[in-house]
Amino acid sequence: YRAVHLNIPVTNKLVSIVGEIDHPLTVRVPLGTTVKEAISLAGKITVEDPAYVMGGPMMGRLGTENTVITKTTNAIIILPKDHHVVVRMEKNLDIEKRRASSSCCQCRTCTDMCSRHALGHPIEPHKVMRAVANHDLSDLSVFINAAYCSGCGICEKYACPQGLSPKSIIQQFKGGLRGAGIKVEKVEPAPVLEDRELRKLPVHRLAARLDLARYD
């Protein structure tokens, strides 16, 4: 707001520092501050071998002590390196594709819980997983519609009963579309699903599933 409407450049950012730390807090720090410097404001880390999640547990990425705060950084989550969230972020995508081939049961829960699908966008994660599992390129719209994925992570962090990674696979296709300069044609979205409100994910259940409720 200040940058757009008041012509004041963004030079600092509010960042929440939470997880395995003595005194979790939200603090305003200058852009370019390292993770190590920011964390020192919240006390001592309470685990010996920490991992640093930059952003949220659903859409964030792993960083290091030397990662710097940018204008898009909103949180640093300190977790043990063997924590479920960290392990999932370190997964090998080639292995995940092979797991899709062997384990995806086409229950379509990923699509049923997809927030973009519920809004009427033509993204169906279960069809992407089916195409990947069977090396099926007969319907390219399945892959092109990956562009409608918001990357929220509900499909792989909560919905999939097999613990597969639809979001990560879809994001790879989405990146490939951008890299190839392919622009997705605008389509008229389908109507919002009537039961969209019933498909929403309770935050407390998500926190419990991710083993993060203890940090609340």
Region spans (language model):
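Redox cofactor-anchoring modules in respiratory/redox and cofactor-processing assemblies
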Residues: Y1-Y215
